[in-house]
Structures are given as structure tokens and as C-alpha cells.
């Protein structure tokens, strides 16, 4: 198995077609197909499902791809350091639920480690995708929360994927809404108070479930609901529609002036915000630094 073969497999997985990948790699389709078959035979697994509509990764293939990507990244770092005679690149990646503070902490990380050359990765995505990204080593760690509502199922999924969860801090749920919202003057808001207004939830794709939801109490039926996949859209809908969402309450005011506020939710629940890693994985220095930055956002009185 060669580095070149791994690069071929990464390209095929990226474009989803052996024909298109062969064109981009400037080799013949039969040569590429043979290379993939040789790699599959040597690894003892089937990497791709093949069909008339194209190819997709198998479960074994997705895991293989994660390791292959790591090998290629390490090879590039080796070449950068000893072939080009340039300073080595600092690399680090995070997949996170849609939190402002995780993005802010990432900015501070880049400021600290962003030297002349670096390759950082930050992805806001759905809960299940975070687990996939960490499992397949697309990123170094993932940020998500556990609660009384989702903990049993989430811990089971985390364990099945050979991952481990470590809590960073806990936070009481808050309602995010615009400062002119009819409920903005209340010291505490109940789920009943929110009933007349549109609820905003983040899309979870094929894994739409209360257990993978990024919002607490998403299992409670509502008459008005909007699902989005962009944090900017959520802010716009709060401002334009008197909509709301439920989250941790950590939302720096400078991101939208004084327009968005958070009000404590009366319900008895706690968000345990933490990170997931592969089992037996050691954190890199950028990883340790990133977690330090995240801990700075811990609520004073959760």
C-alpha cells in the first residue's frame, strides 16, 4: 500500500466517481480501478460500494479514509519540514454544534498558533456528523452537549463509535430572543410562555431526533417551527419574526450589538457541554490550548 494509492482513494471519495477522479488525477480509469482493488485486497476490506449511480463509502471504508487522511497529512508535514525546508504547518480541526463561544475560542487558538504556516479546520454541523468527523479523524475533537433528555442514547452512540466524552462545564438553559420581544422583560421564561412564538431548531439531516437535537425540549410539540442550518439565519429570524431558540445562554453581546438577549428558562434541566475524542487519543498542544479557551466561557453560576 503506497501513499499514492491513499491519495487516489481520497480523491475518489471526494468526487464520488472513479471516472471523474481519474480525469482529475490524469490517469486512466482502469488504472485507478485496479489501484483501488489492490488496496482493498491488501487491507482486507471493501472501501467503496459500487453502483450505476456512482460509488459511496462502506462503513469500513469511512474508517479507512480517516486513517488514510491522517497518513497523507503527516506525509505533507514531513515534506514541508524536510523537503521544502520551510517551518512545519500547525494543524488542528474541530467539529462543533452551533455555538458562538466555540467559534470565538477558535479565533483565539489561531491567534496563538497561527504562525507563518498552518492548516486549521472548523466545522459547525449536526450532532451525528460531529461524531462521524471525530471517529473518522476528519477533526481532532468535537463539541456537543449531554442532558437528562439525551444522555442515555448519546452515551450509547459515543461508546459504540469508540469515542469518549469529557465535560468542560455545565450551563442552565436560556431562551435567545430579540430585545424588543414581548417576553424580553421577564426575568424567567417558561415553555408555556413561548407557545405563541416560532421555535427555531437546527437541522440534523437524516438524524432528526430528540436525542441528536441541539435544542433542549425539542420533543415538546409546537404550532410554529422553523428548521435552519445556519446560525446567521437564526439571528435574522429572531429579529424579523419574534422567533426564539433554546441554548446555553452563552452569547457575547458584541456579535449583534444589544439586539439579542438571553433569558433563563424556568424548566429543570442542565446542559453538560463537553468534547468527544477517539479512545486513547492524546490531545495535541493546539487541542489543549483550545480547551483552555473554551473553559473561559464557563458560566459563573451554572
Please annotate each region the language model reported.
Residues 40-57:
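A short LG(V/I)-centered, amphipathic sequence patch enriched
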Amino acid at each position: 500500500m503506497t501513499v499514492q494509492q491513499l491519495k487516489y482513494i481520497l480523491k475518489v471519495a471526494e468526487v464520488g466517481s472513479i471516472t471523474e477522479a481519474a480525469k482529475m488525477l490524469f490517469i486512466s480509469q482502469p488504472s485507478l480501478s485496479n489501484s483501488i482493488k489492490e488496496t482493498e485486497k491488501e487491507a482486507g476490506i471493501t472501501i467503496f460500494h459500487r453502483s450505476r449511480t456512482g460509488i459511496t463509502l462502506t462503513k469500513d471504508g469511512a474508517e479507512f479514509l480517516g486513517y488514510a487522511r491522517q497518513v497523507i497529512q503527516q506525509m505533507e508535514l514531513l515534506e514541508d519540514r524536510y523537503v521544502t525546508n520551510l517551518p512545519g504547518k500547525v494543524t488542528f480541526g474541530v467539529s462543533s454544534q452551533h455555538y458562538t463561544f466555540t467559534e470565538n475560542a477558535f479565533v483565539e487558538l489561531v491567534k496563538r498558533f497561527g504562525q507563518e504556516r498552518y492548516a486549521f479546520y472548523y466545522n459547525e454541523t449536526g450532532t451525528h456528523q460531529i461524531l462521524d468527523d471525530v471517529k473518522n479523524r476528519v477533526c481532532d475533537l468535537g463539541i456537543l452537549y449531554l442532558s437528562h433528555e439525551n444522555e442515555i442514547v448519546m452515551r450509547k452512540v459515543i461508546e459504540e463509535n469508540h469515542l469518549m466524552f469529557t465535560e468542560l462545564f455545565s450551563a442552565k438553559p436560556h431562551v435567545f430572543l430579540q430585545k424588543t420581544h414581548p417576553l424580553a422583560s421577564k426575568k424567567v421564561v417558561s415553555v408555556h410562555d413561548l407557545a405563541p412564538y416560532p421555535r427555531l431548531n437546527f437541522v440534523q439531516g437524516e438524524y432528526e431526533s430528540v436525542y441528536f437535537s441541539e435544542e433542549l425540549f425539542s420533543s415538546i410539540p409546537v404550532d410554529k417551527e422553523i428548521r435552519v442550518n445556519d446560525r446567521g439565519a437564526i439571528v435574522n429570524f429572531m429579529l424579523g419574526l419574534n422567533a426564539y431558540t433554546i441554548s446555553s445562554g452563552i452569547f457575547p453581546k458584541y456579535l449583534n450589538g444589544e439586539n439579542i438577549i438571553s433569558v433563563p428558562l424556568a424548566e429543570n434541566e442542565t446542559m453538560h457541554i463537553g468534547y468527544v475524542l477517539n479512545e486513547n487519543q492524546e490531545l495535541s498542544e493546539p487541542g489543549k490550548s483550545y480547551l483552555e479557551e473554551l473553559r473561559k466561557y464557563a458560566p459563573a453560576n451554572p
